[in-house]
């Protein structure tokens, strides 16, 4: 701090997307209750995901969707997400809404999720009530259901990036780690509850008779859980709005020269001025005038500059994205086909047999048991997430990352080699280890990278090189993009492998092989901050 006759230091607290010559200020400590409230978004999201996993195939079959359109349903959403995630991530970095940068996007995507569920779970019933012509009814039912599935998948995949960026914006480094563990914990709880409710035969219960069909029952529960969870999430931690440092000079933003409050939201773009009665107020204004063009150029991000920021991201970010892609490719390869694997390989059923045949009924039984296996996965994911907090102090993030990939690779390998009912259900717990790992460790590493960069920025002279337009939203979105890319790879390539091999056992073998390759990658190429 300078004396009373010198210029006042002007501290600008900005995200990684902007020049931050004096570093960033640590956020205040958040209570466990606030972090749990923040994590409810993951509970609601995963609950709805589980309902979709249990019901989307029966819904698509019931409306008569042609097999030729199946691939379009499953590929359209991840393709859209892969293309748009970084754009929206960058837009949220520069959002100037009064109630924050991330929450407007989270609210919009939650509404889109609700609309998507309403369309794919109720579309057929609505069309049946409004359209009499059988041909038009078929066309409208298929169209509305497809739109609903794509809209829900797109929104549910998309929303993870803004939720993580919101957590990173409002929490200290220690609270980020705790928050990510709570996210994984409630992700498991939400998935388990969704799978359990999806396994109940609602048709023969009073609620099923009251609402009409099991599809309407599940929409009722899904809408209720989603609305309550996201209201809780959006009210969890106050988010400071982005101030316009390019149009509001420091003297206007804080005419009294007061520092930011402790509760305060050391927000992106805000100004702190040191209390000093003899400070020269002309100096900060002059500095603001000199920096104004730079600030404007930083906030204006074209598609070209965004792509350049992603292409030129540091190598350790790229390696983390590749490892995330490998992990999700292995995980989705197994999860998307697991119930079919249980029905065909473990139970030796026939999905193409007559619906009243013994082989088909055996297949259905295998699918039901497979759903319970996925429930075991969700429960164990929550349990493992709880113990992760203790384990990280002993084996570090590298050990957690490596162990998650290794256990999943070994577990799926044993399932493929020895397809027994009981051993398969026990080994479903390894899916939970991988799920928890994918939801926590990569984002913990992103938080570590951000903290390291902020420390380096604090040691640089003013006017040093910036991060080429990259912000926390862009980094989280780039990581989340890998989930969509993995879906594209799995949806486009795994069916081809199954057709070539003539058996779905190739699915779990592929998942095992990819995961073990990922073990080597996370050990050799991913950078870990000491």
Swiss-Prot record:
TM helices/strands, residue ranges: 46-66, 69-89, 106-126, 139-159, 185-205, 217-237, 319-339, 367-387, 399-419, 426-446, 478-498, 505-525
Residues that carry a glycan: 356
Top-rank lineage group of the source organism: Eukaryota
GO biological process, one term: melanin biosynthetic process from tyrosine
Catalytic activity field: sucrose(out) + H(+)(out) = sucrose(in) + H(+)(in); D-glucose(out) + H(+)(out) = D-glucose(in) + H(+)(in)
Recorded GO MF terms: D-glucose:proton symporter activity; sucrose:proton symporter activity
Cytoplasmic side, ranges: 1-45, 90-105, 160-184, 238-318, 388-398, 447-477, 526-530
Membrane topology reported for the UniProt record: Multi-pass membrane protein
Subunit structure: Interacts with TYRP1.
Function in brief: Proton-associated glucose and sucrose transporter. May be able to transport also fructose. Expressed at a late melanosome maturation stage where functions as a proton/glucose exporter which increase lumenal pH by decreasing glycolysis. Regulates melanogenesis by maintaining melanosome neutralization that is initially initiated by transient OCA2 and required for a proper function of the tyrosinase TYR.
UniProt similarity note: Belongs to the glycoside-pentoside-hexuronide (GPH) cation symporter transporter (TC 2.A.2) family.
Name the record gives this protein: Membrane-associated transporter protein
Gene: Slc45a2
